[in-house]
From Swiss-Prot:
<keyword id="KW-0812">Transmembrane</keyword>
<comment type="function">
    <text>Core subunit of the mitochondrial membrane respiratory chain NADH dehydrogenase (Complex I) which catalyzes electron transfer from NADH through the respiratory chain, using ubiquinone as an electron acceptor. Part of the enzyme membrane arm which is embedded in the lipid bilayer and involved in proton translocation.</text>
</comment>
<keyword id="KW-0679">Respiratory chain</keyword>
<keyword id="KW-0520">NAD</keyword>
<dbReference type="InterPro" id="IPR001133">
    <property type="entry name" value="NADH_UbQ_OxRdtase_chain4L/K"/>
</dbReference>
<keyword id="KW-0496">Mitochondrion</keyword>
<dbReference type="GO" id="GO:0008137">
    <property type="term" value="F:NADH dehydrogenase (ubiquinone) activity"/>
</dbReference>
<protein>
    <recommendedName>
        <fullName>NADH-ubiquinone oxidoreductase chain 4L</fullName>
        <ecNumber>7.1.1.2</ecNumber>
    </recommendedName>
</protein>
<keyword id="KW-0249">Electron transport</keyword>
<keyword id="KW-1278">Translocase</keyword>
<dbReference type="GO" id="GO:0005743">
    <property type="term" value="C:mitochondrial inner membrane"/>
</dbReference>
<keyword id="KW-1133">Transmembrane helix</keyword>
<dbReference type="GO" id="GO:0045271">
    <property type="term" value="C:respiratory chain complex I"/>
</dbReference>
<feature type="transmembrane region" description="Helical">
    <location>
        <begin position="29"/>
        <end position="49"/>
    </location>
</feature>
<keyword id="KW-0999">Mitochondrion inner membrane</keyword>
<dbReference type="GO" id="GO:0042773">
    <property type="term" value="P:ATP synthesis coupled electron transport"/>
</dbReference>
<comment type="similarity">
    <text>Belongs to the complex I subunit 4L family.</text>
</comment>
Length: 98
């Protein structure tokens, strides 16, 4: 395993631990999710380039499309929650409350 792969895996684990530790605010959770998805994109692109697997060349691009959709939905949810409640706490996202 090369040094680049190790750095990408460290970036993924740092983003994952950030998501687990700082989950009270929605903005920090979205930033950690974005870091995880971008490190997965880099890891997928490096793996496909190293293995010369031509059938999976579109997988990183599809992953980026899903990441863009996730970011757009997350930011729309952040705007909606901050306009409704005034804060971006994740505890305000409970839809079972009346």
């Amino acid at each position: 395993m090369s040094l680049v792969h190790i750095n990408v895996l460290i970036a993924f684990t740092v983003s994952l631990t950030g998501l687990l530790m700082y989950r009270s605010h929605l903005m920090s959770a979205l930033l950690c999710l974005e870091g995880m998805v971008l490190s997965l994109f880099i890891l997928a692109a490096l793996t496909i380039l190293n293995t010369h697997f031509t059938l999976a060349n579109m997988m990183p691009i599809i992953l980026l499309v899903f990441a863009a959709c996730e970011a757009a939905i997350g930011l729309a949810l952040l705007v909606m929650v901050s306009n409704t409640y005034g804060t971006d706490y994740v505890q305000n996202l409970n839809l079972l409350q009346c």
